From Swiss-Prot:
Protein name, as recorded: Monoterepene synthase TPS1, chloropastic
Residues involved in (2E)-geranyl diphosphate binding: 304, 341, 345, 483, 486
Its EC number(s): 4.2.3.115, 4.2.3.-, 4.2.3.177
Binding-site residues for Mg(2+) 2, renumbered to this chain: 341, 345
Length: 590
């Protein structure tokens, strides 16, 4: 049902975010939720005064609803489910037979990078615990590759591992021994380990600079092709910063060419990837139908239509099959965020944006009467979806999450309004002033708060109380990486169309620096924020393990989406290839 028909609050089906009338009256829940509101018809005939509006001339979507509805792989059938179970038994046997800690660590690393580590969580944790307990007795035998892999895999799993384990590879002056640079595999492993650095760990800072220098040397030498590919891949972006699902697709192809490939593990990785992709396609078809029927794309033609790209962000944040509802919510949220962001950045007048922000903050239907028609549609879109999600959540879990979701929306809109005010007054903030607002305007907190509620945290009352008090820092850190990676690739185009100065321009203005120096400063800032976020790898927050993973993955997804340019605003190029490999094309099985 399109948005120009009657809407009731809340709509009843979370799975579709449709505009249907709920079966039960909900006036006892939120008074405004049960009112019947007629959405205005947007048309070329309008009584509103004509305003000179900017246009970003966004490219239309390259992913039509008809195309998305055609995505339907056959990897969900019982024959594949049965084959997966047989392959899992074989891989479990390989885990049991892995001879010695190095072989065990290498197999665990393969499992995780191939994307099937989640199928063997118990076995992996037991094996890592055993290796950790035996560390003191065996560490004298370890080479650089083994030591680095031990550090990376265990720290990533929350074990308390000190970088002091690398001290025996350093000379009496405190520098890394030059002799270890002759080992490209060891260099690669140490390089990857260094990116799990926390603030103050200077040994790992030095390791990163040392290995980067020598890996660039090895990249040009005659080494085994798979090692050369891994070096090139790592220098582009380390494992710890990569979007896991996308990296798994890359690593499956590499693993096929590596020496010592386990054929049954390779088959498991390919089949599991295709089966999960099939589940993703089912969700994507559902979300695309919702967006097509919702009608907002036609009415808000000033905004980016990026449903497929939004679903990429959802996969990047939580890809596991059991989080399908969360991905649907996040994909819909991402598309609504795109509309609201473009309304503030491009289309809305200063006075209109003040009224809209006030309406979202009040969360009251009566406040929309003074809004122009297009803004009424935008307000009702976020109001409808939020109240609907809250209704379903209350029904399923007995907890009212609407106050948290509406506050997240209000905070987001207030941050966008602040930027609009800066543009209108031609004000350039300091970098700190910009970042204090921009981590919210990037939408990271809004996305992560939805991810928390819809990724299955329980018991809810205790989880919410703990979440509100203990997760503000990791949300801010993840959202800051999101903001800064975006700025590095989109700032020039956005400023050209009249957007607020971004982090690069703020630092240029504040420090009197060149653009090249400012870009280097922002890259350094990103590394600094990653170090701070890495503290959460070992933080005692096991009850929020899923949420912490989502926070890390949001930062990783932004890093990958903006690695080759504006992978969200410009719907082609390298990111089109990434989306195709994630959601369109299955891996060929031999």
């Amino acid at each position: 049902m399109a948005l120009n028909t009657f809407l009731h609050f809340p709509p009843c089906s979370l799975s579709s975010f449709s505009c249907a009338v709920p079966k039960l009256p909900l006036a006892i829940f939120h008074k405004t939720m049960a009112r019947q509101i007629r959405c205005p018809r947007a048309s070329s005939q309008t009584s509103e005064p004509a305003l000179a509006r900017r246009s970003a001339n966004f490219q239309p979507t390259i992913w039509t609803n008809d195309f998305i509805q055609s995505l339907n792989s056959d990897y969900s059938s019982d024959v594949y489910v049965q084959r997966i179970e047989k392959l899992k038994k074989s891989v479990r046997q390989s885990l049991e037979e892995a001879d010695g800690p190095l072989a065990q660590l290498e197999l665990i690393d393969d499992l995780q990078r191939l994307g099937v580590g989640r199928l063997f969580e118990r076995e992996i944790n037991e094996m890592l615990n055993g290796i950790y307990m035996d560390y003191k007795e065996t560490q004298a035998q370890w080479n650089l590759h083994f030591t680095s892999m031990y550090f990376r895999l265990l720290r990533a799993r929350g074990f308390d591992v000190s970088p002091e384990i690398f001290s025996r590879f350093m000379d009496e002056t405190g520098n890394f021994q030059t002799s270890i640079s002759n080992d490209p595999i060891g260099m690669l492993s140490l390089y990857e380990a260094s990116y799990l650095c926390m603030p103050g760990e200077t040994t790992l800072d030095e390791a990163q600079a040392f290995t980067c220098k020598h890996l660039k040397y090895w990249k040009e030498k005659d080494v085994h092709p798979t090692i050369a590919l891994q070096i090139e891949h790592a220098l582009e972006l380390p494992i710890h910063w990569r979007m896991p699902r996308l990296d798994s697709r890359w690593y499956i192809k590499l693993y096929e060419e590596k020496e010592g490939t386990r054929p049954l593990l390779l088959e498991l990785a390919k089949l599991d990837f295709n089966m999960v992709q099939s589940a993703h396609q089912t969700e994507l078809r559902k979300v695309s139908r919702w967006w097509s029927e919702f009608g907002l794309a036609e009415k808000a033609s000033f905004a980016r239509d990026r449903l497929m790209e939004g679903y990429q962000w959802a996969i990047g944040t939580v890809f596991e099959p059991e989080f399908g509802q969360c991905r649907e919510v996040l994909a819909k949220l991402a598309q609504l965020i795109a509309v609201i962001d473009d309304m503030y950045d491009v289309y809305g007048s200063p006075d209109e944006l003040e009224l809209f922000t006030d309406a979202v903050d009040r969360w009251n239907i009566n406040t929309i009467e003074g809004l122009p028609d297009y803004m009424k549609l935008c307000f009702l879109s976020i109001y409808n979806t939020t109240n609907q999600g809250g209704y379903e959540f209350l029904k399923d879990h007995g907890v009212d999450i609407i106050p948290h979701l509406r506050k997240a929306w209000a905070d987001y809109c207030k941050a966008l309004r602040t930027e609009a005010r800066w543009v209108n007054s031609k004000y350039t903030p300091t970098l700190d002033e910009y970042l204090n607002n921009a981590y919210t305007s990037a939408s990271g907190p809004l996305i992560l708060i939805h991810a928390f509620f819809f990724s299955g945290q329980e018991p809810w009352k205790e989880a919410i109380d703990c979440f509100v008090s203990s997760n503000k820092d990791i949300i801010r850190l993840s959202a800051t990486i999101f903001r800064l990676t975006d700025d590095l690739e989109t700032s020039a185009e956005e400023i050209e169309r009249g957007d607020v100065p971004k982090s690069i321009q703020c630092y240029m203005h504040e420090a009197g620096a060149s653009e090249a120096v400012s870009r280097a400063h922002i890259r350094g800032k990103i590394s600094e924020v990653w170090r701070k976020m890495n503290k959460y790898l070992t933080a005692p927050a096991t009850r929020h393990k899923t949420f912490n993973a989502a926070a890390f993955n949001l930062a990783r997804t932004s890093t990958c989406v903006y690695l080759y340019g504006d992978g969200y605003g410009v719907p082609n190029g390298k990111n089109k290839e990434n989306i195709t490999s994630l959601t369109v094309e299955p891996i060929v099985l031999e």
